[in-house]
């Protein structure tokens, strides 16, 4: 329960949450722990309702939200997505809504946080906000929420592929279900428990989060691996975004909608299958890995790299989480090239420098055969 409390309320996930972090990431719903509009909206609304109950007028309340926003932003480490959400909330108080609200928010962000768009979190936060702004007026009710979840997931796809090169189709349904669950159940529950923890720690609700984690593990076993789409070049990314904008404009014209949709599918196909022969040598730490792919898509990988381990006694407190060379270089590169299967994995040596990261590679990709 502690990790969910710090994660959902303050945006901090400890290292002992690593297993669940990987499961949430593989299912494409780790963004639920990224502080954004859901948390900001919940806390701002709760703050307003509390002060209104105490008898404050709307005019006084409007100005009290500014110091509250500053304190909350500080507690979350001035997260880019939180700053964006708070700015939009504060501007909405003054009657600035819709695209005007979004445009002014981006302008202010450029002034106070010039490096905002240099981070994946900043770009994704603004992209989500823009799509929500464009689709928020189209219908109400459960059907509209489900359609909105689908539109957001598909609309953000080019940017997700640019930064992460993969997409989990299950995330569309899971985001719809778990965002509702987190917003309606867990945020209020954890907020109350957090306040009570200063008086008396309440641990009786641990079973709820154990139950949630068991469900996540079950869904992870049933769900397929994320789709590896590949990383588009800058020009292909721009072309994808323009095409998606045209799809939105022509959404009521079936023929044009179908035409642009097929064009987008074709672009994603070219990203994943470049239709060219490729030989790449990768620096994987203490050795090199060679990747080969022909025009038909057959792939061969020679060696996976690794780290030489030395027998050095360390105490428990000195142990730390480490990332393998393959997770830093080899796996991200292969995914950026649209690779989801390695037909032949050739290991030229049994030394750690050649085969040390074999387990990480076999977890990340389907491997046809291993040759030693």
Residue ranges and their predicted role:
Residues 1-18, 315-317:
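Histidine-/acidic- and/or cysteine-rich, low-complexity loops and terminal segments associated
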Residues 18, 25, 144, 194, ...:
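Non-globular, low-confidence helical/coil segments that flank catalytic cores
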Residues 133-230:
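Alpha-helical transmembrane segments of multi-pass integral membrane proteins
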Residues 20-174, 235-274:
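Hydrophobic alpha-helical transmembrane segments in multi-pass membrane proteins
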Residues 11, 35, 345-348:
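Conserved residues at the C-terminal ends of beta-strands
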């Amino acid at each position: 329960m502690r990790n969910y409390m710090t994660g959902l309320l303050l945006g901090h996930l400890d290292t002992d949450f690593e297993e669940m972090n990987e499961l949430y990431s593989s299912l494409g719903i780790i963004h639920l722990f990224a502080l954004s509009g859901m948390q900001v909206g919940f806390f701002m609304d709760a703050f307003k309702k509390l002060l209104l109950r105490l008898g404050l007028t709307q005019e006084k309340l409007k100005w009290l939200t500014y110091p509250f926003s500053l304190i909350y932003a500080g507690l979350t480490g001035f997260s880019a997505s939180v700053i964006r959400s708070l700015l939009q909330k504060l501007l909405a108080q003054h009657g600035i809504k819709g695209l005007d609200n979004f445009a002014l928010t981006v302008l202010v962000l450029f002034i106070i946080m010039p490096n905002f768009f240099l981070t994946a979190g900043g770009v994704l936060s603004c992209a989500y906000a823009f799509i929500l702004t464009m689709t928020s007026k189209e219908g109400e009710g459960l059907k509209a929420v489900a359609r909105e979840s689908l539109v957001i997931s598909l609309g953000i796809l080019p940017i997700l592929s640019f930064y992460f090169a993969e997409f989990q189709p299950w995330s569309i349904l899971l985001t719809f279900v778990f965002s509702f669950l987190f917003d309606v159940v867990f945020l209020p529950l954890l907020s109350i428990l957090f306040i009570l923890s200063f008086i008396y720690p309440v641990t009786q609700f641990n079973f709820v989060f154990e139950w949630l984690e068991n469900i996540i593990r079950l869904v992870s076993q049933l769900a397929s691996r994320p789709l590896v789409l590949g990383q588009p070049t800058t020009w292909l990314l721009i072309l994808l975004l323009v095409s998606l904008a045209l799809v939105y404009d022509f959404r009521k014209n079936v023929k044009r909608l179908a035409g642009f949709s097929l064009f987008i599918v074709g672009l994603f196909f070219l990203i994943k299958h470049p239709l060219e022969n490729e030989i790449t040598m990768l620096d994987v730490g203490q050795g090199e890995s060679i990747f080969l792919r022909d025009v038909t898509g057959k792939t061969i990988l020679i060696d996976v790299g690794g780290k030489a381990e030395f027998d050095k006694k360390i105490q428990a407190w000195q142990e730390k989480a480490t990332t393998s060379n393959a997770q830093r270089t080899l796996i991200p590169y292969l995914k950026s090239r649209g690779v989801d299967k390695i037909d032949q994995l050739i290991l030229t040596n049994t030394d750690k420098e050649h085969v040390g990261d074999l387990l990480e590679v076999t977890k990340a990709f389907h491997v046809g055969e291993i040759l030693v």
